[in-house]
């Protein structure tokens, strides 16, 4: 949805190199709407696509009229996605916990050591973030997963054993989700709309499976009532929609 002209040209060039003689770029918001079956005259209206991916966030306003889907405005952040949620969990929860148990002074002054440890912790961060989508607390232990985090400054093996609550997770990642919500607010405000003007809100991307973001979108201050929240669309909505195009 936020591709530049250069990125679009590169995508078309790659398609031609792959042997596709006739092809057309399908915008991600259109793909999401097609995956929901919105290319139907029975579903005319205005829809907000909330696409929170692994590395980027896109919001798009889509108009459906007589079965024709049109993206009439978009906004997003190319540096906001699931990886930012994991980094927030690492920085605000996991690293402080390890610093309480181990001597990590050199990790503060040596960039490559700090980066290596933080990268190793992103897997546990994602695992716990997903687990807390379905539970109020989650446990993690490197002993159970044979994960090597290296040694601290005293030569002691670094092991992570921690329990995280949903409230802790919200405190760590809520700011990132709020950035996405604010982007949607700006998009609606720019077009003179609010949540009451939408037929519904389409959630796309793995992070939207979390109840945390759905609860934030339902807050009165965000102008989204619960009736506007749809279940998250399948993660493969773009290729699925492309397959429909090939079929037709």
Protein language model features and the residues they cover:
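Oxyanion-binding/catalytic loops of NTP- or PPi-dependent enzymes
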Residues: 1-248
């Amino acid at each position: 949805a936020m591709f530049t002209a250069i990125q679009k040209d590169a995508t078309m060039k790659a398609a031609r190199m792959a042997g596709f003689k006739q092809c057309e770029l399908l915008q991600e918001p259109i793909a999401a709407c097609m995956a929901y079956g919105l290319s139907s005259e029975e579903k005319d209206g205005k829809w907000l696509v909330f696409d929170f991916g692994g590395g980027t966030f896109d919001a798009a306003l889509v108009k459906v009229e007589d079965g024709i889907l049109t993206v009439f405005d978009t906004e997003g952040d190319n540096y906001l996605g699931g990886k930012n949620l994991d980094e927030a969990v690492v920085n605000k929860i996991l690293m402080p916990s390890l610093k309480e148990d181990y001597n990590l002074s050199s990790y503060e002054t040596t960039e490559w050591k700090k980066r290596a440890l933080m990268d190793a912790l992103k897997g546990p961060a994602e695992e716990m973030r997903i687990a807390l989508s379905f539970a109020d607390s989650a446990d993690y232990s490197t002993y159970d997963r044979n994960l090597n985090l290296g040694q601290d400054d005293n030569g002691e093996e670094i092991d992570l054993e921690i329990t995280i609550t949903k409230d802790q997770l919200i405190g760590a990642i809520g700011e990132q989700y709020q950035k996405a919500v604010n982007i949607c607010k700006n998009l609606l405000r720019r077009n003179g709309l609010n949540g009451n003007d939408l037929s519904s809100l389409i959630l796309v991307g793995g992070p939207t499976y979390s109840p945390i973001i759905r609860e934030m979108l339902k807050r009165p201050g965000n102008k989204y009532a619960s009736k506007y929240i749809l279940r998250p669309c399948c993660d493969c909505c773009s290729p699925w929609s492309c397959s429909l195009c090939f079929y037709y």
